Structures are given as structure tokens and as C-alpha cells.
From Swiss-Prot:
This is Holliday junction branch migration complex subunit RuvB. It is found in: Cytoplasm. Belongs to the RuvB family. It holds the Pfam family RuvB_C. It comes from Ureaplasma urealyticum serovar 10 (strain ATCC 33699 / Western).
Length: 312
């Protein structure tokens, strides 16, 4: 079975959707190549699965350089930054996913590195220790985050580009599904089936590719009716999944607002997953309301549960 990496486009010409962003990126990349410099440090923020890692890879490929990938929670101390910088060559890309999770000491180390391309290190111990400034190759830091508000302001100010990746249009998702099916599977899918998958993907390419792979699995095993397939894998109207239904049921059982901590305890999920993976779509489509007192299901959310006989 294909992995998510195999679905990722490698160059701008292959990237579907986000036309304005692609147009601007093409201009910035062309200018950078003419100036023979490194691409400006870039911050990508938005929901998970909207193409942040893909764009980082594309920028590196378009520049003809290597892309070194790491996670923010792995960068806690200055030595973590030093070790990462020891791997790069001139104009390489460093991609830090969930960059908001870096430790404070790592953030502070990055500030001078991003501006001056040098790093201060301590050589020796105790009273014999001396600070030495080392130059590092010019490079591009690309940070990705689902929580822009947790990025320290001094770090955010050092990014030359800040791009927001919102949900994709349904037509863009349909085009992604069509292309990936043609390239990787060649399974018979009509327009109606592609539209159903696209409408269930919540505007997220990663989710669209996951649904496509599950549909392919069932089609190969003789299941032709896509609605039956969705029933089997528990995909409901609007693309809601089992964890969405469980979340809505928790709110349905409450007369008043309920707090995030209580929801997490009932569902046995971490608060971060709820805030970043479940709630945004439910809020956007008016299934729930969120305020300072907590979360409450809306009339639309109640109607959805009742119409689909999903009340637990």
C-alpha cells in the first residue's frame, strides 16, 4: 500500500490547489535563485494535513538543496541546535515540524543563528570556559505549526515569509483524489464517488488520501458501493468520524457548557488532539459552540446525531 510520502508532490508544478500561494512562491523562488542566496526563513501555519511538510520539501527541491527534517519537541537545548546545524551545507533547508514545541533555550539559540548565521558556544568548563562564536552555513529554516499563538514573537519576527494553509476547496480535494488514483491505483471511480470522498475529507488533503486508500482496499475486495464502504469504515455525513461522534455525544449529554479538561477525561484523549484535530471542523460547520465557559452542542449538532441515529 502506498504511504503518505508517495502521494506528496515534489515540485510546485505538481502541487494542486492554493494557486495564490503557489504563484507567490514561484516569484520568491525565482528571485532567490537569481540572487544566488538562501530562501528566506519561512513559517507555515494551519491545520494538520494541509501540506506544510510537502511545501517545505518542494521549496528544497526547487532550490536544489537538501531538506533536513526534525520535530520541535526534539529541540530543547542549545546542543540540539548545534547538532542540527552540523549536518547542513550552504543554502540547505531545515524543516522543524510543530516548531512551537521547541524548548525555550532552543528558541533563544535560534535567534542569533537566524539573523547572523553564527552561534556562540562555550568551550571548557567552569572558570576556564570561554565563549567562541562559530559561523554556520547560510540556510533556510522552515517552521510548521498548528498553534501560531505559541510561537514566541522574537522568533516569528525573524521569518521572512509567513504562510497560512487553510482547508482546501472541495474541487481542489477532488482533483487531488483523481490525480493520485490515476498515478497510484487506477481503480474505477466515477465522478460521484470522487465527489463523495472529497466532501468527506474536511478540506484536508492528507485525510482525502487516507479515504482514497481505504476505498481502494474495499474495491479490490469486491465492495463496489462507496456508501457501503463508508458505513464499514464509519465515515458519516460531512466526513465526521467515530471520534467526532463520540465528542458530540459527550456534549449532547450535558445541559450546560463542558470544559476541555472534562471532555478529554471522558474521551480519554489528550487536550491537544481535541483542540487541533476534532474541534476546528465542528466549530467551522456549526456543530458546536465554544466560549470561555466551555463547549456546547448546537441545534445543528443535535439534529445531525438524531437524523443519523448516532445518539449513544
Amino acid at each position: 500500500m502506498k504511504t503518505n510520502n508517495e502521494f506528496r508532490p515534489q515540485y510546485l508544478k505538481d502541487f494542486i490547489g492554493k494557486d495564490q500561494l503557489k504563484s507567490n512562491l514561484k516569484i520568491y523562488l525565482n528571485a532567490t535563485k537569481r540572487l544566488k542566496s538562501s530562501f528566506d526563513h519561512t513559517l507555515l501555519h494551519g491545520l494538520a494535513g494541509t501540506g506544510k511538510t510537502t511545501l517545505a520539501t518542494i521549496i528544497a527541491n526547487e532550490m536544489g538543496v537538501d531538506c533536513h527534517m526534525t520535530q520541535g519537541n526534539l529541540l530543547n537545548k542549545p546542543v540540539d541546535i548545534i547538532n542540527l546545524l552540523s549536518l547542513i551545507k550552504e543554502n540547505d533547508v531545515i524543516f522543524v515540524d510543530e516548531i512551537h514545541a521547541c524548548g525555550l533555550a532552543a528558541f533563544e539559540t535560534l535567534y542569533s543563528v537566524l539573523e547572523d548565521f553564527c552561534i556562540d558556544i562555550s568551550i571548557g568548563k567552569d572558570f576556564n570556559a570561554k565563549m567562541t562564536r562559530l559561523k554556520v552555513p547560510h540556510f533556510t529554516l522552515i517552521g510548521a505549526t498548528t498553534m501560531l499563538g505559541k510561537i514566541p514573537e522574537p522568533l516569528e519576527e525573524r521569518f521572512g515569509h509567513v504562510f497560512y494553509l487553510s482547508e482546501y476547496e472541495t474541487s481542489e480535494i477532488a482533483a487531488i483524489i483523481l490525480k493520485n488514483n490515476q498515478i497510484h491505483f487506477q481503480i474505477n471511480l466515477n465522478d460521484q464517488e470522487i465527489d463523495l470522498i472529497a466532501n468527506s475529507a474536511k478540506g484536508i488533503p492528507r485525510l482525502a488520501n487516507r479515504l482514497l486508500k481505504r476505498v481502494v482496499d474495499f474495491k479490490i475486495n469486491g465492495f463496489d458501493n462507496i456508501k457501503n464502504i463508508f458505513e464499514k469504515i464509519q465515515i458519516y455525513d460531512f466526513g465526521l468520524e467515530e471520534q467526532d461522534i463520540n465528542y458530540l455525544n459527550v456534549l449532547y449529554q450535558q445541559e450546560n457548557e463542558i470544559g476541555l479538561k472534562s471532555i478529554a477525561q471522558i474521551l480519554r484523549l489528550d487536550q491537544y488532539t481535541i483542540e487541533t484535530k476534532i474541534e476546528p471542523y465542528l466549530i467551522q460547520h456549526h456543530f458546536i459552540n465554544k466560549n470561555l465557559r466551555g463547549r456546547k452542542i448546537t441545534a445543528k449538532g443535535i439534529e445531525f446525531l438524531k437524523n443519523n441515529q448516532l445518539i449513544k
